[in-house]
Amino acid sequence: MRCLSIFVLLVLLVSFAVAELDVEGEIVKQLLTRGTLKDADFWKRLEMQGCVCNANAKFCCGEGR
């Protein structure tokens, strides 16, 4: 039973890490393909995932609002 709970915890941890990498990969892709960070839908998705941005187009994820 203990092994099962450890396995479930590891699966959740890995899925969270993959989701975080996906957000960062999306940011890099936006920077490379468009050269700008003014895509409103893109920033809205980031805000929904707990990311914030400032006027200098820098970003910090995981710090809340």
UniProtKB/Swiss-Prot annotation:
A GO cellular component entry from the record? extracellular region
Q: Which residues carry this modification: Pyrrolidone carboxylic acid?
A: 49
Alphabetized, the UniProt keywords read: Amidation, Disulfide bond, Ion channel impairing toxin, Neurotoxin, Pyrrolidone carboxylic acid, Secreted, Signal, Toxin
Propeptide span(s): 20-48
Where exactly are the transmembrane stretches of this chain? none
Which residue pairs form cystines in this protein? 51-60, 53-61
> To which species is this protein native?
Californiconus californicus (California cone)
What protein does this entry describe?
Conotoxin Cal16.1
General function of this protein: Probable neurotoxin with unknown target. Possibly targets ion channels.
Q: Which domain of life is it from?
A: Eukaryota
